[in-house]
Amino acid sequence: MMGIFLVYVGFVFFSVLYVQQGLSSQAKFTEFPRNVTATEGQNVEMSCAFQSGSASVYLEIQWWFLRGPEDLDPGAEGAGAQVELLPDRDPDSDGTKISTVKVQGNDISHKLQISKVRKKDEGLYECRVTDANYGELQEHKAQAYLKVNANSHARRMQAFEASPMWLQDMKPRKNVSAAIPSSIHGSANQRTHSTSSPQVVAKIPKQSPQSGARIATSHGLSVLLLVCGFVKGALL
């Protein structure tokens, strides 16, 4: 009897394990993130969806930025692929976590949205799914590459704004404000000198006709007195 009971328990255990493994093998990504090529300034979306093969305690999706193009190995820009993660692997050492979504159920999806993408956003992104069953955690991941092309118009505008504006005298634009007041002051000083000159001339005394008449009269009296003196001397 004891042997039959042990056989029965073993059969039930392996049956449950087989069913669980069969259901777990049905867990899959229903939507893989795709490689995206965008131009600077555009809005970018990456979609990721996962379906569990059994009743899960919870499902969780995390979006990660793994590394930029300078850190990638040759051929790392290939199509997204599903890869199992090791349980003892430290995910924080793999990149930067961007967002997390957690639900109770068998299906989960999450879109990564990047508005006004820039060149520094280029690189490898990863969708990580944690499937929490009773007594165990299963992790899955899928990757996609974001390629960002430079916006030539934006680059030209940045270069134009960064370069100094040169004038005809080969001085930077920032010196224009200093040059203008000096020229204004110089012209103002010239106007001051030109307007002050008549004032200096006006201070020089001028002889009026009356003063000239007085001078002529005094000379005439002197001559008359001199003549009278000569006549008086002759008569004596």
Swiss-Prot record:
GO terms for biological process: cell differentiation; cellular response to BMP stimulus; positive regulation of brown fat cell differentiation; positive regulation of gene expression; positive regulation of lipid storage; positive regulation of white fat cell proliferation. Glycans are attached at N35, N175. GO terms for molecular function: identical protein binding. Coiled coil: none annotated. Residues 184-199 have a biased composition (Polar residues). It is found in: Secreted. GO terms for cellular component: extracellular region; membrane. Residues 27-143 form the Ig-like V-type domain. Residues 1-24 form the signal peptide. Keywords: Differentiation, Disulfide bond, Glycoprotein, Immunoglobulin domain, Secreted, Signal. Its main location: secreted. N-glycosylated. N-linked glycosylation is critical for secretion but not for preadipocyte cell differentiation activity. The keyword Secreted applies. InterPro entries: Ig-like_dom, Ig-like_dom_sf, Ig-like_fold, Ig_sub, Ig_V-set, IgSF_V-set/TM_domain. SMART domains: IG. Homodimer. Plays a role in the regulation of the early stage of white and brown preadipocyte cell differentiation. Promotes adipogenic commitment of preadipocytes by increasing gene expression of the transcription factor PPARG in a BMP4-dependent signaling pathway. This is V-set and transmembrane domain-containing protein 2A.
